[in-house]
């Protein structure tokens, strides 16, 4: 049993052949005792492996475009502008010497040389 769907009928026409067209999808039902509304399947022009390859290709294309955009944006953010020199680092590195204070009296050190309580 085949159910054809198509455009609404044209006013004044009752011929079923003018309602359906060649581009209209055809729905078929399986004859296993189920009601007509259950299990409608669309008749495809392609086989199942071809449809699977098409879907996987579209998914790979979308994922590839997303990865390409992420790569390009990462490369553009890394490059500093050619006219502006790179900013000096404000974070001291491990190899850099500690900053020297001009006031030696108030500078703090981690090692004490004399004890204030020792009065000999």
From Swiss-Prot:
Cellular compartment(s): Membrane
GO cellular component annotations of the record: plasma membrane
Assembly description: Homodimer.
PANTHER family: GLYCOPHORIN, GLYCOPHORIN-A
Pfam family, one: Glycophorin_A
Glycosylation (residues): 2, 5, 7, 13, 17-18, 20-21, 24, 28
Keywords: Glycoprotein, Membrane, Phosphoprotein, Pyrrolidone carboxylic acid, Sialic acid, Transmembrane, Transmembrane helix
Bias (Pro residues) ranges: 82-100
Main localization (coarse): membrane
InterPro entries for the chain: Glycophorin, Glycophorin_CS, GYPA_B
PROSITE patterns (alphabetical): GLYCOPHORIN_A
Gene3D superfamilies assigned to the protein according to its UniProt record, in alphabetical order: 1.20.5.70
Bilayer-spanning residue ranges: 50-72
Positions of modified residues (Pyrrolidone carboxylic acid): 1
Protein name: Glycophorin-A
UniProt feature, compositional bias: Polar residues: 107-120
Domain of life: Eukaryota
UniProt key word Isomerase: no
Membrane association type: Single-pass type I membrane protein
Residues with Phosphoserine modification: 119
Residue ranges, annotated region (Disordered): 1-40, 78-120
Similarity annotation: Belongs to the glycophorin-A family.
Cystine bridges: none
Chain intervals with Low complexity compositional bias: 17-29
Role this protein plays: Glycophorin A is the major intrinsic membrane sialoglycoprotein of the erythrocyte. Appears to be important for the function of SLC4A1 and is required for high activity of SLC4A1. May be involved in translocation of SLC4A1 to the plasma membrane.
Origin organism lineage: Eukaryota, Metazoa, Chordata, Craniata, Vertebrata
